């Protein structure tokens, strides 16, 4: 019985320590600049797209408490913001030929007031490019394909050396490469899209 009581006392003294440690991490990771450091109360009859007056107070854990009343804001969730009102992490794992949508993490600008979480996921078009031109690759493949110039240009140096020493597979490898580049199968070494 005594060991159960001691266990509960130890557990009770340990739990606030865990909470204070995780609370400290949250405060350091929170952005307290501008509207990002505010918690705003939108009216209950708020209709999406309407301009409303909101009352805002500083978030818990942000230094320098601030209270702003009757601030004009558009009634919308953060994920409904216009593209200029948020930033997203760049998409770097796209395929070369498709323009599919990719899920990425976005966050609202600190000057924007919106409902819900300021960090959200959004589907954006996948169009990451590192500057390789499809036209230049096609020209290199047709004109100097037998020497592997197209593959050297794309950063595929291992297969380019093989193509160089076999004279483009005596022309066969060159013809196949022209078709593969035309349909977008051969892509730059980093997986980016052509410009």
Curated annotation (Swiss-Prot):
Residues 131-179 form the TM2 domain. Its main location: membrane. The keyword Transmembrane applies. The chain crosses the membrane at residues 137-157, 164-184. Disulfide bonds: none annotated. Residues 1-20 form the signal peptide. Keywords: Glycoprotein, Membrane, Signal, Transmembrane, Transmembrane helix. Glycans are attached at residues 55, 93, 127. It is a multi-pass membrane protein. InterPro entries: TM2, TM2D1-3-like. GO terms for cellular component: membrane. Residues 21-136, 185-195 are extracellular. The keyword Transmembrane helix applies. Residues 158-163 are cytoplasmic. It is found in: Membrane. PANTHER family: BETA-AMYLOID BINDING PROTEIN-RELATED, TM2 DOMAIN-CONTAINING PROTEIN 3. Belongs to the TM2 family. This is TM2 domain-containing protein C41D11.9. It comes from Caenorhabditis elegans.
């Amino acid at each position: 019985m005594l060991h159960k009581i001691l266990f509960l006392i130890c557990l009770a003294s340990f739990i606030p320590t865990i909470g204070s440690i995780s609370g400290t991490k949250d405060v350091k990771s929170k952005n307290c600049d501008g509207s990002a450091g505010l918690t705003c109360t939108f009216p209950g009859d708020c209709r999406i797209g309407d301009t409303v007056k909101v009352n805002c107070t500083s978030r818990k854990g942000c230094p320098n408490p601030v209270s702003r009343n009757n601030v004009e804001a558009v009634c919308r969730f953060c994920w409904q913001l216009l593209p200029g009102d948020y930033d997203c992490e760049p998409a770097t794992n796209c395929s070369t030929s498709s323009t599919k949508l990719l899920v990425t993490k976005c966050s609202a600008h600190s000057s924007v007031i919106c409902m819900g979480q300021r960090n959200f996921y959004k589907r954006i078009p996948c169009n990451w490019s590192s500057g390789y031109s499809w036209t230049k690759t096609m020209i290199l493949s047709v004109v100097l394909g037998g020497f592997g110039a197209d593959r050297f240009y794309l950063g595929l140096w291992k297969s380019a050396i093989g193509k160089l020493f076999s004279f483009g597979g005596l022309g066969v490898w060159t013809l196949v490469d022209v078709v593969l580049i035309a349909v977008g199968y051969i892509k730059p070494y980093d997986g980016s899209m052509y410009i």
